[in-house]
Every structure is written in structure tokens, then in C-alpha cells.
Design a protein with these regions (language model features):
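Helix-rich terminal scaffold detector
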Residues: 67-128
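Short, structured beta-strand/loop micro-motifs enriched in basic residues and often containing a Trp
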Residues: 13-23
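Short beta-strand/loop turn elements enriched in aromatics
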Residues: 1-14
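Short, Lys/Arg- and Gly-enriched loop/turn segments at beta-strand edges
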Residues: 42-54
Length: 128
């Protein structure tokens, strides 16, 4: 997202400084939901230092182009039906976690088709 350099992510602490990412990253394209990360304390808050184990998920970010066109809730509904975890961001932007058990190729093909029609902008995040 233009002008945004960091974000807060939900995570489950599984050790002193190890966490499982529990939300879909909008900004950080090096992380995905389900990754196990090692964090360091900076200014009283945890910050990701490195990925310890990849969780197997990929992340895509979708921005609907035409307010009169594709409804973000319809896109989210389709992604949910494919088994993705979906979060809504500012301006109707969606971030989706495509799990290892989801049909990633079909999802990518469908989203690429919407992008080719000019209905959405597509920005990949971390791809497993």
C-alpha cells in the first residue's frame, strides 16, 4: 500500500520469541499467514526478525478498480468458497491467504482474468 511501511499482524506466541502469523499481511510481502517467525523486542513491541518455518500459504492482495463493477464482497465470497482466509482492508482492498490445500492455480487464473478485464488490480504478496 503506498505510503505504508509497516503493519501490525495478529499472531499466536508459541515460545519466548517465536510466533505463528495469524492474519493476512497487507504490506509485508515476505510473510504469509501460518508462517512461524522469530521476533525481537523494539520499543516495547515485537518486530519480525526472520521466518523460521514457512507455513505453506501464499498471499494475494486485490483492489477492485470499478466501484460500479465487481463488488469486493463477491470477490471475498468466491475466495472463501475456494477455502481462502480473506481480510478486508482500506478502500475495499482484500488480502487473501491461499492455503496449501486450496486450488492456487485456479484461484490465480480467476483473479488474473478479473485483472485482464480491468475489474481489479492484483498485487501478489509472498508466494509459496
Amino acid at each position: 500500500m503506498p505510503g505504508v511501511e509497516s503493519e501490525q499482524l495478529q499472531a499466536h506466541q508459541i515460545g519466548r520469541d517465536h510466533f505463528v502469523v495469524a492474519s493476512v499481511p497487507f504490506v509485508d510481502t515476505t510473510l504469509a499467514m501460518g508462517d512461524i517467525v522469530e521476533c525481537v523486542m523494539v520499543g516495547g513491541a515485537f518486530h519480525v526478525d526472520r521466518v523460521v518455518v514457512r507455513g505453506g500459504a501464499s498471499t494475494v492482495r486485490v483492489l477492485p478498480e470499478d466501484p460500479e463493477g465487481q463488488d469486493p464482497s463477491e470477490i471475498a465470497g468466491t475466495l472463501l468458497a475456494f477455502g481462502c482466509h480473506v481480510e478486508l482492508g482500506p478502500g475495499g482492498m482484500l488480502a487473501a491467504s491461499i492455503g496449501a490445500d486450496c486450488p492456487r492455480e485456479g484461484i490465480t487464473e480467476w483473479l488474473s482474468g478479473l485483472e485482464a478485464q480491468g475489474a481489479i488490480q492484483l498485487a501478489p504478496g509472498y508466494m509459496a
